[in-house]
């Protein structure tokens, strides 16, 4: 007599074609509430779609490879006998009961967590599914022997390397014995405490406060929901919220698993269930907010407002520096504000790796000095950076992945060679670009660099003179240092950093000879470039500087 209902894809954000990568059920299967039906995979996360209630699968409407979106029918489910009793009082309106399965599982999750609670027998409360962790320390124990607790009360707090979570009691009762202490390491299935169950009274007691129509435990909830679901939920949540400290929201193991599969830190999600419990709908709403670019304001207001933002960092400390002495406050220049934000974004978003090497520039430096002597009257001063720009062009031709940019799933390989160089100015760092460096000689590049550097110092660079770069060079040659990690100038995928050259004794087979050595620091984007390719690029670049005739090859 149970009526088959449609189980549909819940709210998964703004995705309208998410592929099904796994189907977990087939016709005839008996499933429980929260059992996974299918697994979906977006470009950002893999998630299981759970069943909102127990029953028997009558028909599966999708297969692996199908694309689904919110509202797509997944399976036809014949509800189990227990929930089937609910439609009787609401026979006049079966549609609302089927149309709103999502709110129902949230309250049902608590009774489902304590099926083994008999009348007043003892039960073992164990660590639920906490993912792949096998040794999570207990940092707080909230109960002691003799305490009377309610369902969803926190019993212990665990802390992994990524999050802190409370483990809630699956039901109410009296704590007979606590099996763990602060500092113990626990894993899924570890016994936390022995509870003398009040299942027959605790869970129904909470339910009985709201509905009056029937004495059976879960069935009465849908009856008032048919008339006014929102008002029914509000009174239940209000007293619960009043009794909660608000320090940590709780979530059932199934909801924690659901959140984990979506890549959501459950501690950031605000709970709307009883006692601040986090429901699946809360997690889905959080994900929808993040994917729509709203940064899930309700969920993250506290964390972001504390100064940690999305990275979950500690709040930035506030200091009154005047307590320690005299200070002066200066506003950041516009260039520093803009470049600082860009550098921070690039450092956080790009997986940087830096290879350090060195190049023998003894002969090249002698050649540079000779050129400067020859061009003394023309006023052109050749710098080592001009040679490095020409060497960079040759290296980019040999290793085209370095002359590229990421565009979603595509790699854009550039056929032009525009090389940027970092210029230090009184107002901050800028990167002028030498356009078509492959078509210019060292003297022309030196002249153009001098002109661009002057414009940069005077604050007169035009936007197009800082755009279109393929690769950048950051030179500290005139200042000092040995090696450093330059930050990639996105959307480029690599940057070369150079420091001050120094004399180094090198064994030539017969004796040690002084050689002028230039430190090289190549930072590269690991999404595009592999370590071996980066090492070859650095080696080849050094060979070009050591013997500039190789440029002609």
From Swiss-Prot:
What does the record give as EC number?
2.3.1.12
- According to the record, the residues making up region (Disordered) are 97-118
SUPFAM superfamilies in the cross-refs:
CoA-dependent acyltransferases, Peripheral subunit-binding domain of 2-oxo acid dehydrogenase complex, Single hybrid motif
Q: How is the cofactor bound?
A: Binds 2 lipoyl cofactors covalently.
Q: Keywords assigned by UniProt?
A: Acyltransferase, Lipoyl, Repeat, Transferase
Required co-factor(s) are: (R)-lipoate
Give the molecular function GO annotations. Answer: dihydrolipoyllysine-residue acetyltransferase activity; lipoic acid binding
So where's the catalytic machinery, residue-wise?
526
Q: Which GO terms describe its biological process?
A: pyruvate decarboxylation to acetyl-CoA
GO CC terms on record? cytoplasm; pyruvate dehydrogenase complex
Lipoyl-binding domain residues are: 4-78, 122-196
N6-lipoyllysine modification sites are: 44, 162
Q: Which domain of life is it from?
A: Bacteria
Chain ranges of the Peripheral subunit-binding (PSBD) domain: 250-287
Alphabetical list of PANTHER family matching this protein: DIHYDROLIPOAMIDE ACETYLTRANSFERASE COMPONENT OF PYRUVATE DEHYDROGENASE COMPLEX, DIHYDROLIPOYLLYSINE-RESIDUE ACETYLTRANSFERASE COMPONENT OF PYRUVATE DEHYDROGENASE COMPLEX
Quaternary structure and partners: Forms a 24-polypeptide structural core with octahedral symmetry.
Q: What does this protein do?
A: The pyruvate dehydrogenase complex catalyzes the overall conversion of pyruvate to acetyl-CoA and CO(2). It contains multiple copies of three enzymatic components: pyruvate dehydrogenase (E1), dihydrolipoamide acetyltransferase (E2) and lipoamide dehydrogenase (E3).
Q: What is this protein called?
A: Dihydrolipoyllysine-residue acetyltransferase component of pyruvate dehydrogenase complex
């Amino acid at each position: 007599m149970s009526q088959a209902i449609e189980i549909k894809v819940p709210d998964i954000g703004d995705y309208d074609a998410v592929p099904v990568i796994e189907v977990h059920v087939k016709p005839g299967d008996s499933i429980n509430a929260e059992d996974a039906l299918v697994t979906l995979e977006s470009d950002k996360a893999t998630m299981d779609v759970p069943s909102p209630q127990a029953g028997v699968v009558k028909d599966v409407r999708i297969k692996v490879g199908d694309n689904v979106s919110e509202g797509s029918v997944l399976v036809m489910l014949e509800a189990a006998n227990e929930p089937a009793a609910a439609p009787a009082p609401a026979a006049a309106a079966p549609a609302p009961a089927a149309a709103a399965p999502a709110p129902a599982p949230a309250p049902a999750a608590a009774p489902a967590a304590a099926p083994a609670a008999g009348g007043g027998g003892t039960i073992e409360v164990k660590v639920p599914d906490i993912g792949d962790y096998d040794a999570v320390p207990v940092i707080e124990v909230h109960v002691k022997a003799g305490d009377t607790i309610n369902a969803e009360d926190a019993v212990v707090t665990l802390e992994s390397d990524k999050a802190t979570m409370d483990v809630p009691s699956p039901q109410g009762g009296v704590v007979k014995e606590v099996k763990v202490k602060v500092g113990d390491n626990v894993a899924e299935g570890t016994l936390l405490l022995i509870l003398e169950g009040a299942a027959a009274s605790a869970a129904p007691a909470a339910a009985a406060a709201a509905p009056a129509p029937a004495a059976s435990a879960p069935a009465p909830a849908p009856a008032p929901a048919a008339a006014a679901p929102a008002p029914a939920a509000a009174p239940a949540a209000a007293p619960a919220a009043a009794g909660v400290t608000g320090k940590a929201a709780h979530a059932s193991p199934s909801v924690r698993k659901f959140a984990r599969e979506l890549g959501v830190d459950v501690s950031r999600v605000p709970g709307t269930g009883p006692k601040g419990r986090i429901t699946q709908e809360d997690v889905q709403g959080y994900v929808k907010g993040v994917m729509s670019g709203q940064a899930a304001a309700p969920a993250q207001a506290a964390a972001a407002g504390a100064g940690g933002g999305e990275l979950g960092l500690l709040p930035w400390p506030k200091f009154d520096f005047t307590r320690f002495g005299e200070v002066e406050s200066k506003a950041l220049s516009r260039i520093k504000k803009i470049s600082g934000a860009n550098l921070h974004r690039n450092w956080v978003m790009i997986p940087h790796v830096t290879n350090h090497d060195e190049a023998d520039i003894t002969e090249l430096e002698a050649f540079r000095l000779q050129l400067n002597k020859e061009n003394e009257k023309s006023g052109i001063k050749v710098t080592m950076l001009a040679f490095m720009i020409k060497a960079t062009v040759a290296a980019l031709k040999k290793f085209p992945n370095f002359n590229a940019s990421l565009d979603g799933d595509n790699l854009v390989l550039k056929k032009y060679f525009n090389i940027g160089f970092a210029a230090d100015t009184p107002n901050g760092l800028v990167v002028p670009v030498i356009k078509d460096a492959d078509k210019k000689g060292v003297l022309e590049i030196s002249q153009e660099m001098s002109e661009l550097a002057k414009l940069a110092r005077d604050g007169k660079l035009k936007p197009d003179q800082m755009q279109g770069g393929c690769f950048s060079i950051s030179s500290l040659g005139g200042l000092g240092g040995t090696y450093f990690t330059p930050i990639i100038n996105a959307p480029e995928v690599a940057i070369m950093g150079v420091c001050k050259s120094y004399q180094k004794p090198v064994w030539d087979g017969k004796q040690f000879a002084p050689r002028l050595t230039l430190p090289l620091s190549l930072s590269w984007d690991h999404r595009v470039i592999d370590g071996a390719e980066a090492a070859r690029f650095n080696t080849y670049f050094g060979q070009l500087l050591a013997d500039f005739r190789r440029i002609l090859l």
